[in-house]
């Protein structure tokens, strides 16, 4: 199996960031994805008005050994970087780009603190929906990349209110590092912020696998304000559980 690499972008914003991040981190642990990975990169931005203020110490404490002989030491495969300014997803996407260039055979998962600045039941449903397919079902994602797909996820949308831009709406995805190397990296630093989300689809010849599409983020739904930012989408809508 290829090496598995996880890149996470976190924004420590508002009063719910620890709750969200802890849930996301625990999911990595309980699904076995953490154990299967060879590298986990955390790119973090702190908002000055966050509550509580001790986010830096908290995330480092979370990823320390528990009962091992090396108690108190950050796991060697975990790298935590705090960015000096908020450039949204850009700095973590740059890390992915640079890592992929040096490690073209690896498989990369990207996810982030989706919805932390617009925290509602609807955005939480959206986040959990994406996490179900890319984290809980991570072995299925690996299988699809092994089969020859370049990237996979949910909500692969092309026709948007902003024009034709293939992308995974919400920006949670798995991708081959070799495929990352074929993307238009100018999208990352574009002044138009949506290019960051559209970066993953900037190769028109991509072989995509989409596990599921709620259709809530289709063009007409977004125009009607009936997308995932507004509409609740509980787990029973996409699983048999």
Q: Where are the model-predicted features located?
A:
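ER/Golgi luminal nucleotide-sugar-dependent glycosyltransferases, focusing on the catalytic module
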Residues: 1-241
């Amino acid at each position: 199996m290829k090496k598995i690499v996880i890149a996470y972008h976190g924004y420590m914003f508002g009063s719910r960031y620890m709750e969200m991040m802890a849930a996301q981190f625990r999911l990595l642990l309980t699904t076995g994805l953490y154990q299967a990975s060879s590298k986990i990169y955390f790119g973090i931005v702190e908002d000055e008005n966050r509550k509580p203020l001790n986010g830096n110490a908290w995330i480092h404490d979370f990823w320390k050994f528990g009962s091992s002989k090396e108690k108190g030491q950050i796991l060697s495969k975990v790298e935590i970087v705090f960015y000096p300014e908020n450039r949204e997803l850009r700095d973590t996407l740059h890390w992915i780009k640079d890592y992929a260039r040096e490690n073209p055979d690896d498989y990369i998962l990207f996810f982030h603190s989706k919805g932390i600045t617009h925290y509602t039941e609807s955005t939480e449903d959206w986040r959990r929906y994406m996490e179900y397919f890319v984290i809980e079902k991570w072995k299925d994602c690996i299988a699809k990349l092994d089969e020859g797909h370049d990237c996979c996820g949910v909500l692969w949308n092309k026709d948007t209110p902003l024009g034709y831009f293939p992308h995974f709406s919400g920006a949670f995805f798995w991708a081959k590092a070799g495929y990352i190397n074929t993307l238009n990296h100018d999208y990352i630093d574009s002044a138009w912020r949506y290019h960051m989300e559209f970066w993953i689809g900037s190769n028109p010849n991509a072989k995509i696998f989409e596990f599921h599409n709620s259709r809530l983020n289709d063009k007409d739904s977004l125009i009607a304000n009936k997308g995932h930012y507004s509409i609740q989408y509980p787990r029973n809508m996409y699983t048999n559980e």
